[in-house]
A protein has these predicted regions:
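Hydrophobic/aromatic ligand-binding patch that stacks against planar heteroaromatic rings
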Residues: 22, 119-124
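Short glycine-rich anion-binding loops that position phosphate/pyrophosphate groups of nucleotides
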Residues: 9, 38, 77-78, 102-105, ...
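Short, Asp-centered acidic motifs that coordinate Mg2+ and/or phosphate
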Residues: 96
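Hydrophobic/aromatic beta-strand patches that form the interior of the parallel beta-sheet core
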Residues: 31-33, 72, 129-133, 170-172
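Glycine/threonine-rich flexible loop motifs
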Residues: 105-114
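Electrostatically charged, flexible surface regions
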Residues: 41, 145-247
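A cross-family phosphate/adenosyl-ligand binding-site feature
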Residues: 3-6, 13-15, 19-93
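Glycine-rich phosphate/pyrophosphate-binding loops
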Residues: 124-149
Length: 247
């Protein structure tokens, strides 16, 4: 099984390396291609970091613990990396794309803005099965994230993911703790776990602030179940027409 590992936190992310090791240890043929710099919040954007989409810089990297696994630092956002992989830029096009492990949850309809999820959705448009993996690390948490917990939960889905129809996408969120049970299937919350507020400063700029949302979460939604300490998995669909809309 040819597998691409990517993310939006960048090629140096420990979460990326942990996910790559998990996929390799599962017996999959793994290649890692991730942004040379952090590209969080880029959605499925097809943007090259240098602004020239005709040429994208790619640098081979060596990562401890991933001997024998090709690792590429790519001057591009994760959506473009997934597209490049589908076109054979890093070897045979992947049958499976794993995106993550993201430092922080990706829940609710706010996944639209996630580079982690955006890479998975882009890959699905090109026939790959994709899994986005995120660890629910609080923004102010200074302890070491439990990457191994996320890998263990994700690995429990690997075989099921591989058996899904081409183009399938799963979004997995895992609580940041030493152990977690298998994920519960969940619907998308109306919003993510973070709400953005804007304020006109009067000096020609707009001030942005982020606030964690913990109240009024829809029961059974991914954000609500994750807040209760459960891992969640949500099946996503990429861009599709709406034939029922009357206009």
């Amino acid at each position: 099984m040819k597998v691409l590992i990517t993310n939006d936190d960048g090629v140096e992310s420990p979460g990326l390396h942990a996910l790559a090791r998990g996929a390799r240890d599962h017996g999959w043929d793994v290649v890692v291609a991730a942004p040379a710099e952090e590209a969080s919040g880029t959605g499925a954007g097809l943007t090259a970091a240098a602004g020239d989409t005709r040429r994208v810089a790619v640098e081979r990297r060596e990562v401890p613990g991933l001997a024998g696994v090709p690792v590429y630092a790519v001057a591009a956002h994760p959506g473009l990396i997934a597209l490049l992989a589908a076109q054979g830029a890093f070897g045979e096009p992947p049958e499976v794309v794993l995106s993550g492990i993201n430092l922080g949850a990706n829940t609710g309809r706010a996944v639209l803005h996630s580079g982690t999820v955006g890479a998975a959705l882009t890959a699905s448009l090109h026939g790959a099965r994709a899994l986005a993996v995120s660890l629910d690390v609080a923004p102010d948490d200074e302890t070491d994230p439990h990457w191994d917990t996320a890998v263990t939960v994700a690995a429990g889905l690997f075989d099921r993911l591989a058996a899904l129809p081409p183009g399938s996408v799963l979004n997995l969120n895992v609580p940041d703790r030493a152990e977690s049970g298998p994920p519960r299937r969940a619907g998308l919350a109306e919003s993510g776990t973070v709400q953005v507020h804007v304020e006109d400063t009067g000096d020609g700029t707009i001030a942005l602030s982020a606030e964690l949302v913990g109240d009024d979460l829809k029961p059974g939604s991914d954000a609500a179940l994750l807040a209760e300490g459960h891992a969640t998995v949500t099946a996503l669909r990429s861009v599709a027409e709406d034939p029922d809309l009357v206009w």
